[in-house]
């Protein structure tokens, strides 16, 4: 990480910094990110961004993320995180946000341009995530318009789909799951620590062409299984009866902590569903998905409140998965878009 440097932008009172990463700074960033998410109803920063920042704090990494801030005294007015490319073949990822009180003044645009300049000639290797437009019929939010204004064009669309839960839906999901049986050679079980390496192998194979999921490392896995939301009883694995290390398929659920109460919260998430390429074509994905849905239908948050909804994310071009989730009652709630410099979708 670069040493702290400061310059005062000519048109604002904000100070731009790229501070050395510390635990105190990460706490400040988390507070900023939570406040933005509370205001906007969607997080501007992905789970992977938070994980990469934590990893960089805990251990020395060859390609640490870069965190740029626009500060007003002790207040973070805007933040820009660049996840550095790990190889010549990979691209980097940018996520950024402006605090609500500082929007509409041009401060975000000036800061974004400054941060991109700090990336130098490598800036063209980065793609920008913009989270949470209302639907997929156009660019509806200032953030999406902002991306376009700065020469970025959409190259990937990710749907957040939601299934509200009521008693009828809960019963239906449980009945559907009970009606599905695994092949005779497989058994359903839940995750244990002994599954780390077998799971990583199957995950990499199942998501060989996925830009994020297929690249999960042991450190990434342990970061997630060590988090406060992880529940092994919600991580389902279909494996050979005679060989637990032979994983045919899996589905992982997530119930985030500290969600509060609302019409659709607390919510649980179908975090990831994967099928070993050697086992594809037999309906295992649907069977494991239904098992996870039945689990979430009867689950509660950390305070004992039953879940009000189930969420999941799916790429817009994954028509098979989209059709499956639509058939199960899910509908698109918001849309995330990834942008690249000078490209069109």
Identify the residue ranges that each predicted region occupies.
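Acyl-donor-binding surface of acyltransferase catalytic domains
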Residues: 1-10, 87-88, 100-184, 339-341
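Phosphate-binding active sites in nucleotide-utilizing proteins
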Residues: 204-256
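Conserved acetyl-CoA-binding loop-helix of GNAT-fold acetyltransferases
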Residues: 104-118, 272-275, 281-298, 322-327
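Conserved donor-binding loop and adjoining core beta-sheet/short helix segment
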Residues: 18-19, 30-136, 248-267
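Short amphipathic alpha-helix that is part of the acyltransferase structural core
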Residues: 2-56, 175-214
């Amino acid at each position: 990480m670069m040493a702290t440097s400061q310059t005062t932008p000519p048109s604002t009172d904000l100070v731009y910094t790229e501070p050395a990463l510390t635990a105190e700074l990460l706490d400040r960033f988390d507070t900023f990110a939570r406040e933005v998410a509370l205001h906007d109803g969607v997080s501007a920063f992905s789970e992977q961004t938070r994980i990469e920042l934590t990893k960089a704090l805990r251990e020395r990494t060859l390609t640490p993320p870069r965190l740029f801030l626009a500060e007003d005294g002790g207040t973070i007015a805007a933040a820009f995180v660049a996840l550095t490319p790990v190889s010549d073949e990979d691209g980097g990822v940018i996520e950024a946000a402006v605090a609500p009180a500082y929007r509409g003044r041009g401060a975000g645009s000036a800061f974004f341009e400054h941060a991109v300049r700090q990336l130098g000639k490598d800036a063209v290797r980065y793609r920008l995530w913009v989270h949470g437009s209302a639907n997929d019929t156009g660019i509806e939010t200032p953030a999406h318009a902002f991306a376009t204004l700065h020469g970025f064009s959409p190259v990937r669309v990710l749907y957040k789909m939601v299934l509200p839960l009521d008693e009828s839906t809960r019963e239906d999901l449980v009945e559907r799951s009970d009606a599905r049986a695994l092949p005779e050679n497989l058994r359903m079980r839940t995750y244990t620590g002994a599954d780390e390496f077998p799971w990583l192998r199957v995950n990499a194979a199942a998501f060989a062409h996925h830009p994020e999921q297929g690249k999960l490392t042991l450190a990434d896995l342990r970061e997630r299984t060590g988090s406060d939301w992880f529940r092994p009883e919600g991580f389902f694995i279909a494996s050979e009866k005679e060989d637990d290390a032979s994983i045919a398929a899996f589905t992982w659920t997530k119930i985030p902590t500290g969600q509060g109460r609302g019409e659709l919260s607390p919510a649980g998430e179908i975090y990831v569903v994967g099928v070993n390429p050697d086992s594809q074509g037999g309906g295992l994905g649907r069977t494991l998905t239904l098992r996870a849905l039945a689990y979430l239908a009867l689950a509660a948050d950390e305070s004992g409140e039953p879940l009000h909804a189930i969420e999941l994310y799916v790429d817009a071009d994954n028509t098979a998965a989209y059709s499956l989730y639509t058939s199960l009652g899910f509908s698109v709630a918001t849309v995330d878009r990834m942008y690249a410099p000078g490209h069109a979708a």
